[in-house]
Structure formats: C-alpha cells, structure tokens
Amino acid sequence: MPKELQVSLLGELRVTSAGTEALLPASRKARALLAFLVASGRPHRRERLCEMFWDLPDDPKAALRWSLSKLRRVVDAPEQPRIIADRERVHFEADGVDIDFRDIHARLRRRAEPLSVAELESMAGQLDLVFLDGLDGAGGEAFDSWLMAERDDVQAARVEGLRQLAVQ
C-alpha cells in the first residue's frame, strides 16, 4: 500500500501527497534544501545549511527560515510535521514516507529474498534518471560536491542492480 507522502529524488524532485503531486516552491534553493534534508536522512546545523545554500551578503538565517516555512506547506500534515527544526538543527522526519532512492537502495542490499527480473529492470530504469535533475548550482560549492557524491552513489546502485540482473 502506498504511503501518504512520497518523495522522488530520481529525476526532478517531486513530492506526492495522497496521490496528488504537490506544488513545490519556485525557489531552486528551497527545493534543493528539501532534497538535501530528505536524502541525507539526518539533522543538520542551521549554520551549515546557511553556508551550503546562501551567500553571506544576503541574510542567510532569514532565507533559511523563509525556505523552511515554504517547505512545511508542502510536506507537513496537521498531525504529522515533517520539517523538524529547533534553534540549532533542522531535519526531515522520514518515518512513513516513501523515498524512491532509499527504497531502491534498501531493496538492492536485502539478501533474504532475490529480486525478480521485472523488479530489477524497473529499478535500473529508475536509476537511469539523473539524481535531483535540475538542481545543479542551486546551492554553494558544498551542495554541488554533495550532489556529485550522491549521483556517484546512484550510479553505483545502478551497476549493482544491473549486476544482479545479469546473474538472474
């Protein structure tokens, strides 16, 4: 059964809630911030996020607050906040959320039951998509470096999926 909230990191960032695609903020930085929080799966210091996404001449703390308010409208539900922030840290609460790349990665690593040819072909097709397509340059150098490393991980997962497909 599909979960209430789905986040797709493969291809362009997409968020689907209750079967309806959510309208993401127009700001590429806000979308990149959401993608980073979802993909990393851990809390981040506010200062680090400001450094990753905003230049110092701007007001990075205000820009972060603005972006978080826009993102909460996309992913939070009244009974289930997803963007969790305190004075020090920010993270995305992923419990009960389908995240395409995390799901594929976990299924490829699971050794208890072999995946079918159809599943492996489907995963290979998904992994052919560019991870967070269109978000290049949406943050600073640290974000671009992180994005490049994540794309390398996607490529490694694709190779593993194709390897498993070849031995079927």
Q: Where on the chain are the PLM-derived regions?
A:
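DNA-binding patch around the recognition helix
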Residues: 2-8, 66-95
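Short, flexible loop/turn motifs enriched in small residues
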Residues: 8-9, 28
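Short, Lys/Arg-enriched N-terminal segment that forms or immediately precedes the first helix
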Residues: 9-22
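Structural motif
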Residues: 12-14, 41, 89
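DNA major-groove recognition helices of helix-turn-helix
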Residues: 15, 29-34, 49-50, 64-78, ...
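Intrinsically disordered, charged and Pro/Gly-enriched terminal/linker segments
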Residues: 22-24, 28-30, 39, 54-61, ...
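Short capping segments at the starts of secondary-structure elements
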Residues: 36-48
